Structure formats: structure tokens, C-alpha cells
Amino acid sequence: MPSASLLVSTKRLNASKFQKFVSSLNKSTIAGFASVPLRAPPSVAFTRKKVGYSKRYVSSTNGFSATRSTVIQLLNNISTKREVEQYLKYFTSVSQQQFAVIKVGGAIISDNLHELASCLAFLYHVGLYPIVLHGTGPQVNGRLEAQGIEPDYIDGIRITDEHTMAVVRKCFLEQNLKLVTALEQLGVRARPITSGVFTADYLDKDKYKLVGNIKSVTKEPIEASIKAGALPILTSLAETASGQMLNVNADVAAGELARVFEPLKIVYLNEKGGIINGSTGEKISMINLDEEYDDLMKQSWVKYGTKLKIREIKELLDYLPRSSSVAIINVQDLQKELFTDSGAGTMIRRGYKLVKRSSIGEFPSADALRKALQRDAGISSGKESVASYLRYLENSDFVSYADEPLEAVAIVKKDTNVPTLDKFVCSDAAWLNNVTDNVFNVLRRDFPALQWVVSENDANIAWHFDKSQGSYLKGGKVLFWYGIDDINTISELVENFVKSCDTASTLNSSASSGVFANKKSARSYSTRSTPRPEGVNTNPGRVALIGARGYTGKNLVSLINGHPYLEVAHVSSRELKGQKLQDYTKSEIIYESLQIQDIRKLEEQNAVDFWVMALPNKVCEPFVETIQSVHGKSKIIDLSADHRFVSESDWAYGLPELNDRAKIANAAKIANPGCYATGSQLTISPLTKYINGLPTVFGVSGYSGAGTKPSPKNDPKFLNNNLIPYALSDHIHEREISARIGHNVAFMPHVGQWFQGISLTVSIPIKKGSLSIDEIRKLYRNFYEDEKLVHVIDDIPLVKDIEGTHGVVIGGFKLNDAEDRVVVCATIDNLLKGAATQCLQNINLAMGYGEYAGIPENKIIGV
């Protein structure tokens, strides 16, 4: 066997990696979420450690031990650095009430109260505040049966007469008090909320008696509890408008809470730890509703509460982003579900049906397959063309597996002794939603043995080790396989792999095979963009803003208000529904809360010319899919990062000063660049062909860049005389800048104490002696000579001068004495040219207006 490193797949960290992990956890994680700091010696008193905007007090006698126990508990459940990062990324990025909705079955409180309280106490001590709602079904049944009354159900819904209602109410209050008391005994502040949250009408008074159909959810009691630093503990009792108490199934009530709060996690705790297949007696690990719901509901064992639970979960997920899911688990697996990729119990999600194909003609279209393949590293880097690969497939014996939207596509070649997974191109959404696991499970089912190759630097390398039986490292690539026990077959596999690596090295190719890789597309902005299209359209344009409550939405509304042709037709925000759109004078516009069906109807009626998706990352896809399904005439611009890394044949990248303006003008869908990414690209691009190393970008933004959700990064008091570094490596803008200029960059963002505006200091290594300082200044002036929104100066630009203006100022050029490094400074208003102004430029181009229509001349520096 050739000499190289034979790797053994392991699922646990070794001692060395564990030490590094603990070290990194101590530095980056514990400080961020522990309820008290780790200090030495233990006798030091811990007081008034602030968590969010509530105050938590820990006594000196138990503070250290409680924190130590919490950290040990966390380490036992989070076994990889990736899962630590997942915790930091997700659970510190949302408001506290958006963390999780946890529905607790009544049997859990009776049988597992201590475990439940311990798990909730753990979450509390790491600064997380789930909304807890519990049932009381077993207790009610037991009390009724003790009275000689048989519990009565129709379609899984308890018939609740007045006597039963009295029992239900008493049981709810008893169980609520038991849970709150158990939590308080563990030092957790908990608030019983037994009424006042759900307003309901009768579901069917004649049929079900005192059973409610929830019409609205009052958020204030829950938000007040969390703000005060107490876990909200709810029952599912509801009231009519006149005060009549009604019984509501706890699963249904939990679903209504999830619709209102849109939490990161929706968890149903029951004593079985999931849904049990009544035919086999086995726990179901995953239910993909789009594919399995109809057949599942026909099963004889799906009845009563199980049928109601599945139906309610489906109705809930139909109105949440496709990435949402519901987990049904036991209390012992709660932390595993919240903090690990593997999860536990039964996960229910909408999912997609997987389609098996064996010819190109079976795909929805060649263009659809082409777009999916653009995600492959070898193709996106230009080392292989889509056309040549498709021609290769036409003459190959292959089979492919993919979900319906082609977010995950696996192509297996069958012309070798051991079939080869030749391509497996997956979007970020596919990884996030575990579509990759679905596809791989099908591969295992259909192929007893399989081989594939991955770059050792792949972000998901641990996932591949987990899926494989063996592996072999050579030249920065890892060969994986499973299902092979014969040593001669393994030797042959490795020999062929080594030969291919040696051949690739000879051809000076350092890229991976492309399977699962995540490399950027190399592009260059060293040449100017195409001429600016003339604005010839003077017809009115109707704009619909989805998610317009943030700073960017407000600035865009202000710009549209001064635009000669554009008008706001619809503005959607769940929080502001019913309120008047402020600072818009062309007409009276009232905030709506547009749902999927509303958007489809508007698109069918041709009521909108341009849709603006002003939503957080990973949220807009259901809206985009709905608009596209109508095949109407409208266009879409996405202000999130969701579509900045896809093929430009699908989403044009909307940076007019650097990208092809004609491409933007002709696009049906436009990805609006990020604020930091815009300023950084404009600062680096004139020197692209001179780069000789890793450019570094030191950026400081005003706190408006941290959004409107409360956090230390947008708290003026916390920021006073302060500067907060964050996401110092692998920030999404680092990827965006690198992908667009065709060179890796290092990006280090910070938040400053001012409101809006970004300052960038960019260090660019160049070939020694290739440019003089005068040549550099001239290069920049010539590069942006005809760009109205880019102003080049000699002095260092200042944030106070750029705030409220609509362009980018570049200056402060400095060449070091060795003449091998250039420093350039730039400023940009993150809310305007970094977001709203750029959005308007793109809309203008796509609508055929003048590119700068609606942008105030007196707010453009240099004009």
C-alpha cells in the first residue's frame, strides 16, 4: 500500500483535541453565556452578573459549583467545536423569547419532574429562556376514572363538560405549581402563567362542550416574565372574550405560541421520547411531511392524540419557514436536541420528496441541473465546465438522487467495481435542514458499498468521517468508503486514489475533487463594468416590502417616498400590523402581515412590480418559491445573504459599480450585497491584479448594523467609550468579499459607539516595487472616474462625514517603505449605500429607470 496517512474515523474528540476544545470553550463560550464568570479562587463572591436585560443574582456559596456543574453538563452534551459554534451562532442571535417553545406532556411532570426541572435549570443557567407550556392529560384521566367517569374523546379532542372542566382546571393549577416549585428549589426564577395568554372561541360547543379554538395570543405576560429574568411556565387554558374558561389541547396551544414567536426550536416532551410506530414498536426518528403525511395518517395505529398531534404539527409547519422543524423527545434528550446536530427522538419537518433519476432528461430542466451543479467547487472555480460535465453524464452509467428544488444533488457513477459518489452538491439550506442525511440514507439503502473524495479542509469533514467506514489522506484530499471488508479491494481503491492525486499534482491542480467542497468562485473586478443602461421607463412601479420594520426598510421607504416613479403598494410586518407606515406621504399605507397565500394572490393579480425581501437570513425562501410558482412578471430583490453565493444566472449580484449593469438590469432576481462587503470590495478591487498575499480588512460599524433586536452590540450604554470585536474569522462577509474579488481576505468586524456608518482600514500586500504611491492614487481615480457614488480623496475619510450620505469615500492611501503593502481607508453608510441606496440602484436598473433616480443629489459626496 502506498505510504500516506491512513485515518481511523472516530466520533469523539481525542485527548489533545479535547484539551484544545475545552480551552476554546473557556475563552469564547463560557464567557458569553455562563450565568457567572469562572474565577479563582472559588471563595470570590459573584454578584449582579447581567444576563440580557434581566438581572440574575448568584450567591457566593453556590455560584462557582453551579457554574462548574453547568459547564460540565454542557460539555457532556456538546462534543464538537462545530456544535459550540452552533450554540453561539443561533442561540445568541435572537431575542430571548425566540429561543424555544417547549411543550411538556403531563406524564413528564408526574414521572420525570426532577429531570425536567434540572434540564430547564441548565438552560436558565446558560442564559436561555424557553417558553414552557405543559399539559395535564394523565392527571385529568386519573382523577376522572377515580370518580367512575370514563374520559370521552372525539378525533383526539377531550369532550369537556362543566364537571370535566373543573377537574381540568384543578389539575392544571396543581401541575403548574409543582413544576414552578421544583424549578425554584434549583435556584431558577420561574413565573406561573395559568391564564391570560390565549383568547379563544368555542371549537364546537354542541360537539366538544367547553373546548376552545385559539384566536389570538397575548405576548405581554410571557415577554414580561422573560424580561424580569424568570422562565414563563404556561398552561393551555384559554378564555373567551367574556371570560369563560375553555380547555385547549396543549399541543395545539404550543403550536399557536410557535406561530407567534417563531422560535429557533419547537420541542414536544413526552414520556415515550418520540412517536412510536404502532406496527413495529420502534421509535420513528424522522417524518418528512411532504412525502409521508398522507400515508402516515392512513395507518391504523395513528389515532386519537397521535393523529391530532401530527395534524397540528403539519398545520404549524405549513406556515413557518421550510427550515423549521418540531422535535418530539423525552426529557433526558432535551439538551442533546438543543445543542447537537444529531438531535434525538422524532423530528418532524416538511422536507422534500427525494427523486431518483438515471438520465439528464429526467430532471425538471437542463437549466435546473446546471444551476445546481454551479455549487460544485470544480465547476464554480472554472476548472470544469457544466457543459462538459453534462456531456460526460450523457454517456455514463449513473444514478442521481435529489430533493425537489435540487438543493441537494448526489450523482453516483456505477462504472467502477465500487460505485463512486462523483458529485454531491448541497446548498447551505440543505446542510442546515439535514437534507444531506436524507440523501445519504438513500445512498446507503441502494449502494451496499460506496467511495468518495473530500478536501481535508471541507467545513463538513466530521460529517464525512461519521458516514464512512474507513478513510485515507493524501495531498490534502481524503478518500472515504463504506461497505468494503476485503483488504485487497481497499488496497486497489487507495492505489487508484493516490495515482489520481499524483496526476493532479503534476497538472498543478490544488483543488479537491469537488465532492462536498466549499470553495469560492474566482472572479476579478480588475476591468470596469459595462456601460450604464439609459433610463427610459417613466411608468409607475409598485413595490412590496416584506419584513420592513428594521432600519433598512425605513430608509428604503424614505427613498421611495422621494422617487419620481416608485410607490409603496404593500408593506408587511407581523409586529406592526394595522399601524400606519410612517414618513410615507404619497398615500396612506397600513402595515399588513402577508402570508404565503396573500403573496400568491398578489402575484397572480399582477399587483406588485418589485418584491423587496427585507428578512433575516434563511427566512425568505418560501416567499420566493411562492412568487416564482405563479410565473408572473414581477422581480425580486433579497437583502439577506441567502442568494449572494448562488449562480448569477439565477440571482444577479447587485453591486453596479463592479458588476455588469446590463446583467442586473435584465435579472428577475437580485441579491443585494452586504454593507461591509460592498465597502471592502470597492476598496480592494482596483488593486486586484496586484494582490500578492492575504488582504486584511479591519472594519468598525455603527451599532445600527447590529439590527433592532436588543443585544450588547446595539446597546448605546454598553457601547459608551467601548469597542466590541465579534466574528473575527469566517464571518459571512469574509466569504462574500473573497468570493467576489477572487482572492481570500481576512475580515475583522467591530461595533463602535456611533449609530450608523462604517470605517474600513484595508491592508493589501502587493508585489514589491510594482506600484508607487502616485500610481496607486491615479489607479483609484481612473477606476472610479465615472462612478457617481464612489468618491476618491487623498485624505483619510471620516465616518462623521459619510453618515446619512449615499456613497463610498475611499482615501488615506499609504505605501509602506518596503513598497510591498498598500493601506487604503474607506467609509460607507451601512444603512444607505450599504443597504437601502444600493437596493434602490438595483431596482432602478431592473425597472429601466435612471440608476440614481430617487437618490438625493445633496446627499452624495463629491457631487
Swiss-Prot record:
Keywords: Amino-acid biosynthesis, Arginine biosynthesis, ATP-binding, Kinase, Mitochondrion, Multifunctional enzyme, NADP, Nucleotide-binding, Oxidoreductase, Phosphoprotein, Transferase, Transit peptide. Residues 1-65 form a transit peptide. This is Protein ARG5,6, mitochondrial. The protein precursor is cleaved into the two biologically active enzymes, the kinase and the reductase. Present with 1180 molecules/cell in log phase SD medium. The kinase activity is inhibited by arginine. The keyword Methyltransferase does not apply. GO terms for molecular function: acetylglutamate kinase activity; ATP binding; N-acetyl-gamma-glutamyl-phosphate reductase activity; NAD binding; NADP+ binding. GO terms for cellular component: mitochondrial matrix; mitochondrion.
